[in-house]
UniProtKB/Swiss-Prot annotation:
Heterotrimer of A, B and C subunits. Gene3D superfamilies: 1.10.10.410, GatB domain, N-terminal subdomain. Allows the formation of correctly charged Asn-tRNA(Asn) or Gln-tRNA(Gln) through the transamidation of misacylated Asp-tRNA(Asn) or Glu-tRNA(Gln) in organisms which lack either or both of asparaginyl-tRNA or glutaminyl-tRNA synthetases. The reaction takes place in the presence of glutamine and ATP through an activated phospho-Asp-tRNA(Asn) or phospho-Glu-tRNA(Gln). Its EC number is 6.3.5.-. This is Aspartyl/glutamyl-tRNA(Asn/Gln) amidotransferase subunit B. It comes from Chlamydia muridarum (strain MoPn / Nigg). PROSITE patterns: GATB. InterPro entries: Asn/Gln-tRNA_amidoTrfase_suB/E, Asn/Gln-tRNA_Trfase_suB/E_cat, Asn/Gln_amidotransferase, Asn/Gln_tRNA_amidoTrase-B-like, GatB, GatB_C_1, GatB_Yqey_C_2, Gln-tRNA_amidoTrfase_suB_CS. The lineage of its organism: Bacteria, Pseudomonadati, Chlamydiota, Chlamydiia, Chlamydiales.
Length: 488
């Protein structure tokens, strides 16, 4: 990256499509379920049959209102649906029912931690709309699956308030956490339950100008999102630097791109349509949506504790490291697992480390996260308590953790009962002999410690633990070692 590139900044906004986990579709009684046989979850409404009239799903409305409350948005007492007209094979009606001028939620914000700094990202609006079907290609022909047609969506539109790929990914992560906590979507990005359209433009640093934006469609991976934003940022900067005297609007026209993960580049799909190209007009078959203040308050009362407030509580009440607190709260199941474990163990920092680092790493190979392995929170608490009480060493604890993950059905106590060889060394006479031997064989390190070099103590402890295969109680090792060095 040349020096000139550092004199530019990105301006980024996200449009996020979230499939709501209602039992039926937004405007019809057809089943809303992913993975069924093609064209089995359909109705005359979602296939655009003449005379079929839409009926609004009240559960979808409730979920949209709940989201509005979660992000502290202004839930509209009156909102309206519009037709967005376009022709494409996966849209049998040749229009989408959306909310163009009067969305159900305006404003709101999402708080996220970006590289240790708390940032607040503002939302423009959130609106209800129905999804399109899905084209499936088979060699020289294509089929259309209308199971997804009519699935309820909320589209969450942020303001252009992000200025780096790191900002965008942090915002997206925080948003998905909120959606998961309030339970309005399964948030399965691989199945398309959450899809990100990323808008990016660039400008010289210090400028307030908003240049033409490029939209990168259907990102379903945070890694790809970061890569795409970086690649598109540098592509646009290069275009402007290569054409310094031309009209910026012509240098980088408004367009839609896609991300090619193999070539690591954005690929042009089409130039941007204008709003008038969609011929928006009021949906004639649906009345104005009216919501009362009392209904909004009733929905607001059902909000759980949200990720950001939980994150702040973990730092203050449990004295957790910020990075581990963030990992814990990013998934509501993991957060619940941790809080259940704290009922049996008060070493909160050790608990957070075992859950987010030790067990998370071991569970990765199973394809499951810790809360879904069958390992109970009480067992992890028991493991930490055993270490703290000197029942086992840290090394033995890791061996027990390996067995807990491989068996999924045994507590540390069960494992120690079946594998007594894992119990720590209890022969104090034998341990004294090992300590005496290590001190005698490492006279230089003993002298270093006596001269104030604290690292020498760690080296000597390491030698003792090595000879005892990690089974010597660390506290007893320190006691015997310090006594032996005083006598040396």
């Amino acid at each position: 990256m040349g020096i000139a590139h550092t004199e530019w900044e990105s301006v980024i906004g996200l449009e996020v499509h979230v499939e709501l986990n209602t039992a039926s579709k937004l405007f019809s009684p057809a089943r809303n379920h992913f993975g069924d046989e093609p064209n089995t979850n359909i109705s005359p409404v979602c296939t655009g049959m003449p005379g079929a009239l839409p009926v609004l799903n009240k559960d979808a409305v409730r979920k949209a209102v709940l989201f509005g409350c979660a992000v502290e948005g202004d839930v509209a007492l009156f909102s309206r649906f519009d037709r967005k007209s376009y022709f494409y094979p996966d849209s049998p009606r040749n229009f989408q029912i959306t909310q163009y001028e009067h969305p159900i939620v305006r404003g709101g914000c999402v708080r996220a931690i970006v590289e240790g700094e708390e940032k607040t990202f503002e939302l423009a609006q959130t609106h209800l709309e129905d999804d399109a079907g899905m084209l499936k290609h088979f060699g020289d022909f294509a089929g259309v699956d209308y199971n997804r047609a009519g699935v309820p969506l909320i589209e969450i539109v942020s303001k252009p308030c992000m200025f780096s790929a790191e900002d965008a990914v942090a915002y997206a992560n925080a948003l998905v956490s909120i959606l998961s906590y309030i339970g309005i979507s399964d948030c399965n990005m691989e199945e398309g339950s959450v899809r990100f359209d990323v808008n990016i433009s660039v400008r010289p640093k210090g400028s307030k100008e908003l240049r033409n934006k490029v939209e990168i469609k259907n990102m379903n991976s945070f890694t790809f999102m970061a890569q795409a934003l970086e690649a598109e940022k540098h592509r646009q900067i290069e275009e402007y630097l290569s054409h310094p005297n031309e009209d910026p609007k012509k240098v980088v026209p408004a367009a839609t791109y896609r991300w090619d993960p193999e070539k690591k580049k954005t690929v042009l799909m089409r130039l941007k349509e204008r709003a008038e190209d969609y011929m928006y007009f009021v949906e004639p078959d649906l009345p104005v949506l009216q919501i009362t203040e009392s209904y909004i308050d009733e929905v607001r009362q059902t909000l759980p504790e949200l990720p950001h407030s939980k994150y702040m509580r973990y730092i203050t009440d449990f004295d957790l490291a910020e990075d581990l607190a963030m990992i814990l709260v990013s998934d509501r199941h993991t957060a619940h697992f941790f809080e259940t474990a704290t009922m049996s163990c008060k070493n909160y920092r050790a608990l957070s480390n075992w859950i987010t680092v030790e067990f998370a790493g071991r569970c990765k190979a199973t394809g499951k996260t810790l809360p879904f392995t069958g390992i109970l929170p009480e067992w992890v608490a028991q493991l930490v308590n055993f270490i703290d009480r000197g029942v086992i060493t840290g090394k033995i604890a890791k061996e027990i953790a390996d067995k807990m993950v491989s068996s999924f059905g045994e507590s540390p106590e069960d494992i120690l009962r079946r594998h007594p060889s894992l119990l720590p060394m209890t022969d104090d006479h034998a341990l004294r002999a090992i300590v005496k031997e290590v001190v005698a064989q490492n006279a230089a390190s003993v002298e270093d410690y006596k001269n104030g070099k604290a690292k020498a103590l760690g080296f000597l402890v390491g030698q003792i633990m090595k000879r005892t295969e990690g089974k010597a109680p660390p506290k007893r090792v320190n006691e015997l070692l310090l006594a032996a060095m005083r006598d040396a």
